[in-house]
């Protein structure tokens, strides 16, 4: 089996998409391929078919290979709950909560498990494309590293180092990273990649020659800056407002926002513009307000209260349409109770009181794949998605459920999810990915179109669009990199 590891000079340099591109290229060339990232830190997660939780970046990479996402592609997921604490997910299940130092002391405990996962991949696939995290030059963390050079050494993988030229300082970041690596680690790096370049590559060539003289490894290519409709995992990317798009969707960007990949399918609609708001001054008059998921619902509810957005949301709810997803659904209720101090020690807190329901946090985390029917619709419809939450919500008789769940992790069930008020303009659901399918997305956007005097439209199938975008990404990267050299590095050609 062949393997290659993509590391970067920093976070957000484009490692995840370079890995996705290589996965698709190798697949196009006839090889069986699997992505692997030993440890991921993200608030964007996904639930596999067997009800386990993993990072979204490896989900996209799995799609690039044509595989169903599985937790062995991302055995450890860290979900920050505050600046210094995180929830640790191991093999898809909650391992516990820890401080940064506590986890640093734990890491070596997982080494054997990671090696075992990788050994199985070696037996099953022709090529494994690995991804590092942050930078391999974090010298204060090197002694217990299990995701960058520590992982590369564990499985004897060659490394390609990616730098982001769009931020500036790419030569210094690449040379500086190499400077801080140990001699054995430097030998493992077989090439550099310049990512997100805008302009004429000819202007860059003298710098590339000088860089090669300094670091003594070749630059394998320059990848142009390209806008693709593929999800971004590292942060709540600021969506570019479409000047020509008549449908304005505002999303509350809360401090602990999670699973904002729920917005990606909406972003693919040509006449829809999405913008994040963090203050009442930015609120304006959107056609739809979305309150997204949160890793700390209570603290984010307090944030809405403190910054004045609670007042704006309540005023908007008189005539505007609001959709809450997961944590955003919970804040719409009348009360949130936390008897086990899952999030804070407040015990309970009043919600926005826009839906007559209350949420009670429990110790056990719910992680399930679900299939649901949108209620009160004449058309045959199915919505697919997944749930990731720590609480259950109970609503009164005068609140109608939004969905009926009929399949949970592959088993037949029959229970209600979500709620919608009597007026029909405020609703919420626990289902992540609710907009990915055509049915619910098309229904909501067409309602907004009609309200603005616009014609209804058919929504495109998001999965088809994603496949086209992955092919486009692969074409760009194939044309930009020395693939013959990369195949030589992994011993395939």
Swiss-Prot record:
CDD domains: CobQ_N, GATase1_CobQ
Gene3D superfamilies reported for this sequence: 3.40.50.880, P-loop containing nucleotide triphosphate hydrolases
A biological process term (GO) from this entry: cobalamin biosynthetic process
UniProt keyword annotation of Transcription present: no
Catalytic site: 326, 432
Gene from which the chain derives: cobQ
Protein name stated in the entry: Cobyric acid synthase
PANTHER family xref list: COBYRIC ACID SYNTHASE, DETHIOBIOTIN SYNTHETASE
Gene Ontology molecular function, alphabetical: ABC-type vitamin B12 transporter activity; catalytic activity
Top-rank taxon, per record: Bacteria
Functional summary from the UniProt entry: Catalyzes amidations at positions B, D, E, and G on adenosylcobyrinic A,C-diamide. NH(2) groups are provided by glutamine, and one molecule of ATP is hydrogenolyzed for each amidation.
Domain GATase cobBQ-type: 246-440
Biological or metabolic pathway of the protein: Cofactor biosynthesis; adenosylcobalamin biosynthesis
Organism (species): Clostridium botulinum (strain Okra / Type B1)
Record-stated family: Belongs to the CobB/CobQ family. CobQ subfamily.
Keyword set includes Heme: no
InterPro entries noted in UniProt: Class_I_gatase-like, CobQ/CobB/MinD/ParA_Nub-bd_dom, CobQ_GATase1, CobQ_N, CobQ_synth, GATase_3, P-loop_NTPase
Keywords, in A-Z order: Cobalamin biosynthesis, Glutamine amidotransferase
Membrane spanning residue stretches: none
Pfam families: CbiA (PF01656), GATase_3 (PF07685)
């Amino acid at each position: 089996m062949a393997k290659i590891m993509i590391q970067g000079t920093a976070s957000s340099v484009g490692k995840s998409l370079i890995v996705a591109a290589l996965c698709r290229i190798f697949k196009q060339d006839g090889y069986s391929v699997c992505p692997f990232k030993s440890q991921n830190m993200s608030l964007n997660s996904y639930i596999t078919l067997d009800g386990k939780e993993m990072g979204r970046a490896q989900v996209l990479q799995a799609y690039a290979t044509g595989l169903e996402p599985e937790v062995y592609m991302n055995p450890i997921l860290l979900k920050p709950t505050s600046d210094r604490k995180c929830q640790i997910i191991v093999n898809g299940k909650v391992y516990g909560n820890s401080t940064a130092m506590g986890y640093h002391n734990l890491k070596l405990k997982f080494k054997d498990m990671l090696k075992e996962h990788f050994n199985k991949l070696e037996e099953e696939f022709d090529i494994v494309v690995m991804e590092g995290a942050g930078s391999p030059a974090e010298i204060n963390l090197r002694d217990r590293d299990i995701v960058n050079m520590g992982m590369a050494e564990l499985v004897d993988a060659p490394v390609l180092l990616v730098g982001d030229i769009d931020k500036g300082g790419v030569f210094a970041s690449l040379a500086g990273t190499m400077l801080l690596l140990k001699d054995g680690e430097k030998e493992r790096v077989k090439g550099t990649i310049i990512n997100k370049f805008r302009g004429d590559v000819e202007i860059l060539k003298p710098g590339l020659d000088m860089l090669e003289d300094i670091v003594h490894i070749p630059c394998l290519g320059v990848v142009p800056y390209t806008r693709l409709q593929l999800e971004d995992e590292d942060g709540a990317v600021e969506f570019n407002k479409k000047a020509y798009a008549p449908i304005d969707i505002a999303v509350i960007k809360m401090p602990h926002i999670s699973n904002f990949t729920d917005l990606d399918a909406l972003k693919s609609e040509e006449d829809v513009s999405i913008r994040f708001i963090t203050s009442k001054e930015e609120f304006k008059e959107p056609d739809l307000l979305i309150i997204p998921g949160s890793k700390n619902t209570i603290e984010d509810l307090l944030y809405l209260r403190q910054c004045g957005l609670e007042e704006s949301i309540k005023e908007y709810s008189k005539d505007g349409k609001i959709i809450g997803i997961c944590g955003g659904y919970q804040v719409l209720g009348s009360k949130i109770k936390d008897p086990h101090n899952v999030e804070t020690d407040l015990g309970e807190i009043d919600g926005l009181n826009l839906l007559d329901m209350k949420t009670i946090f429990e110790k056990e985390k719910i992680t399930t794949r679900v299939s649901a029917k949108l209620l009160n619709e004449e058309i045959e419809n199915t919505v697919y998605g997944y749930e990731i939450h720590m609480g259950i919500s109970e609503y009164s008789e005068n609140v109608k459920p939004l969905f009926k769940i009929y399949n949970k992790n592959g088993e037949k069930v029959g229970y209600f999810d979500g709620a919608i008020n009597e007026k029909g303009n405020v609703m919420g659901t626990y289902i992540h990915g609710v907009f990915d399918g055509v049915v619910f997305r098309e229904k909501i956007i067409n309602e907004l179109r009609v309200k603005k005097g616009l014609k209804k439209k058919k929504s495109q199938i998001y999965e088809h669009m994603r496949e086209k975008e992955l092919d486009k990404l692969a074409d760009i990267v194939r044309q930009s990199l020395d693939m013959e050299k990369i195949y030589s590095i992994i011993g395939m050609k």
